Amino acid sequence: MPRLEEIDDFNDIDDLDMELAELDPSLRTPIAPKITPKVVRSQDQENPAFLPGTNNNSNSNNNSSNEKEQLSFINPKTGKVERSEAISKKDLEEVKRFQVLYPCYFDINRSHKEGRRVPKELAVENPLAKTMADAVRELGILCIFEGEKCHPQDFGNPGRIRVLFKENGQLIGAATKFKGGKRQLMKAVGEYMKRHPTTIESLREIPYGPDFDNIEFKKIPRVKGFKMNEIVPLHSPFLMGHPMTKSVYETPKITAAEKSFKPPKNKYKVVRR
């Protein structure tokens, strides 16, 4: 009999932090930034702390503050996305041990090759990272919400979550209920998302900055040739107002061909004698 082996997906290949243009060298995607070389002068790299008339203490304080970062997490009491206290880069490295889940894992319009990880009966239309976070919170598993991160195959739907599922190779906390590993967890998340389908009102539950106060919540038209959802977060590059993708929705103007100028022919008068 063939031997079946359990695949440990603790180190997820989709846990990527890189520019989209690095994955798309042809730069055919609407938001792929063109990588251009930059020239940096040596005098621009001088440390201002060693220049005369500057305060070295203030510079050291700024450096220490720059080493701190914040994370978004789901408050288990309120169910809302809240910001954590500033954490060091060392603690941030510990967070990267969490396993990653993307919305495209549950997209019913995608094939397994295009990013779907669950069976079609557990997939939904327009999956959102916030709904995934609500599902994990209901299961009692620690969850971190990263609203800006996105899967390279689903760059128009920003958002992903990190879950603390294993530690030292062992299931911990509420995750011990999922002996089947990450696949069983994704099945439970898919069942939750089937019970809570995505609507326009779902977008209001996602935290935004003040720049999005006057933006209307609505569905967006699909573009032929792109795998995209109709309901995406307001900070999605697929929105029609986004300067990087606005041209995708505009019909190109067809300019009439210019008429070529032909010089008049010389006329000759024939005189008969």
From Swiss-Prot:
One of its GO terms (molecular function) is 7S RNA binding. It comes from the Eukaryota. Residues 55-65 have a biased composition (Low complexity). Fungal signal recognition particle (SRP) complex consists of a 7S RNA molecule (scR1) and at least six protein subunits: SRP72, SRP68, SRP54, SEC65, SRP21 and SRP14. Signal-recognition-particle (SRP) assembly has a crucial role in targeting secretory proteins to the rough endoplasmic reticulum (ER) membrane. SRP is required for the cotranslational protein translocation for ER import and preferentially recognizes strongly hydrophobic signal sequences. It is involved in targeting the nascent chain-ribosome (RNC) complex to the ER and is proposed to participate in the arrest of nascent chain elongation during membrane targeting. SEC65 is required for SRP integrity. GO terms for biological process: SRP-dependent cotranslational protein targeting to membrane; SRP-dependent cotranslational protein targeting to membrane, signal sequence recognition. SUPFAM superfamilies: SRP19. Residues 25-71 are annotated as: Disordered. The gene is SEC65. GO terms for cellular component: signal recognition particle, endoplasmic reticulum targeting. It is found in: Cytoplasm. It holds the Pfam family SRP19. This is Signal recognition particle subunit SEC65. InterPro entries: Signal_recog_particle_SRP19, SRP19-like_sf, SRP19_arc-type. HAMAP family: SRP19. Keywords: Cytoplasm, Ribonucleoprotein, Signal recognition particle.
